[in-house]
């Protein structure tokens, strides 16, 4: 059977989307990828393509190859920026180039009749993140919520221009996390189960608004209920 596909495309936060234990020796936590697979079971396949440490500059090289070799993708997230928005270093991508890269990805997806969803970067707990990144900090490689907001706002503008949905995760984290927003992160940058749950909920909201035909509740369950299958299975595919 040929299932339609939902592509999750991005950096480490996408790569870790199925990780139920984001904290070593910790308890199982909510996993975005597993939640989506569960909700879309017998409706649509979830195709995860996340690349730890990658930027929009590098991701732009990968996306054409993914789309060339994967068939029947109908919807996709583009979730990049947490690396691009770094103040300096090999992962830093200037804002104009970053936006142009994302624009090219959106255009490429549209050429394949894929419905894009742009995701903005979340938040960063500098105190926790920088404890483990002393060498990077010494070189002047910083991530800040102020810069994340600049990149997120630029993505929101791009999404509006391209008439595609946008998820402002930084604002959702601030609203849902309140004074305890740091709990939405594991190491100060990557998401905890609580962070992924907010991501999931915001994602499903925009799907319901912009692409309602691909919201899980509106998609048809593939094949008959087992109670309706004849003993010999002869009516399964009818």
Swiss-Prot record:
It is an enzyme of class 3 (hydrolase). Pfam families: Lipase_GDSL. One of its GO terms (biological process) is lipid catabolic process. InterPro entries: GDSL, Iah1-like, SGNH_hydro_sf. It catalyses: 3-methylbutyl acetate + H2O = 3-methylbutanol + acetate + H(+). Its EC number is 3.1.1.112. The record marks 53, 83 as: Transition state stabilizer. Disruption phenotype: Accumulates approximately 19 times higher amounts of isoamyl acetate compared to wild-type in laboratory scale sake brewing. Optimum pH is 7.5. The active site is at residues 12, 187, 190. Keywords: Hydrolase, Lipid degradation, Lipid metabolism. GO terms for molecular function: hydrolase activity, acting on ester bonds. It comes from the Eukaryota. Belongs to the 'GDSL' lipolytic enzyme family. IAH1 subfamily. Plays a crucial role in the hydrolysis of isoamyl acetate in sake mash. Hydrolyzes short chain esters from acetate (C2) to hexanoate (C6), showing more specificity for shorter chain exters. No activity for decanoate (C10) esters. Homodimer. This is Isoamyl acetate-hydrolyzing esterase. It comes from Saccharomyces cerevisiae (strain ATCC 204508 / S288c) (Baker's yeast).
């Amino acid at each position: 059977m040929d299932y339609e596909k939902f592509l999750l495309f991005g950096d480490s936060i996408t790569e870790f989307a199925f990780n139920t234990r984001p904290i070593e020796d910790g308890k199982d936590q909510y996993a975005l990828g597993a939640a989506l697979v569960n909700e879309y079971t017998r409706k649509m396949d979830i195709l995860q393509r996340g690349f730890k440490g990658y930027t929009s500059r590098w991701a732009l090289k990968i996306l054409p190859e993914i789309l060339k070799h994967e068939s029947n993708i109908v919807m996709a997230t583009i979730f990049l920026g947490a690396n691009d928005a770094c103040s300096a270093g090999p992962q830093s991508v200037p804002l104009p180039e970053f936006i142009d890269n994302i624009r090219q990805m959106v255009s490429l997806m549209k050429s394949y009749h894929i419905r894009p969803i742009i995701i903005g970067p979340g938040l960063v707990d500098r105190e926790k993140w920088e404890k483990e990144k002393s060498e990077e900090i010494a070189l002047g490689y910083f991530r800040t919520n102020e810069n994340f907001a600049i990149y997120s706002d630029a993505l929101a503008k791009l999404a509006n221009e391209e008439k595609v949905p946008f998820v402002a995760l930084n604002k959702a984290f601030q609203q849902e996390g309140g004074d305890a927003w740091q709990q939405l992160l594991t190491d100060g940058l990557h998401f905890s189960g609580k962070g992924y749950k907010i991501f999931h909920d915001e994602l499903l909201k925009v799907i319901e608004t912009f692409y309602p035909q691909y919201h899980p509740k509106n998609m048809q369950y593939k094949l008959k209920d087992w109670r309706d299958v004849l003993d010999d299975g002869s009516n399964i595919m009818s």
